[in-house]
């Protein structure tokens, strides 16, 4: 990625050196990575507070006006050129100082929201592929503590579908303290995080109400959703006030004002995305009179990814790979991603 903007800012290069792992780091030969909303948002500078449109408004050509100084997850400038890619499944092929050589040959998943890169202070983290180089390459280096061994019969493409989306969903579910028999509403349920949330909520034996486009409803039911509502319908008419315990929101946008009204007293609203637009209206009386909890979810404690690894190794989660591309087809992959005509993840495979 050479700068903020449209697809022209993505360059496929074959002349970059293989990274050298420094103290505490490992070098990973990448088997597969995956496309995520954050790749688009970082490319177009959507995280900048001066951008108020939905993601797709600038997804192809970028936005006319952004502020480079706050256009990243952490609110600091992105250093270009940047290798993106928030997901990575691969094999450790070299280690730096103070890392045991026994780790060479390990199959690993890289944690997306990395804490130990900066500090152990709570809520301080950076995003793999945004504030540091990521998995859209043949090789990547990370701190050894951020490369998690994985033992699974799934292939690299399937495993690469998990890190970013599933850790985001698991963190939201954990923060909301979803319990058996809770009713959970998931917006954007056919996307990477949304479809992950469907599986992870069902894993906790709670009821899932999913919102998605009509042509994806059957796939969401097959995935485990108990009820599916077509996107754009009046949610209060479908469900009634005070009908859900938790909202997992990845969309925001014009329909947002309905969400607090759907929550029961003491309910929790969690958010980790706003692809339909980040600016919403809230009647704060609904918030305090119903004793609601509003939870923004970015930072993830290490336990979230550790739990995700265990779920995968116990075959409790089903990977959703919609399509695979070679790494040099990254522009096509992002175009297809923005078209939203699939359920699950689009995978990028580097040359082997």
Q: Can you name each region flagged by the protein language model?
A:
Residues 107, 154-233:
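Mid-domain Rossmann-like dinucleotide-binding core that forms the NAD(H)/NADP(H) cofactor-binding site
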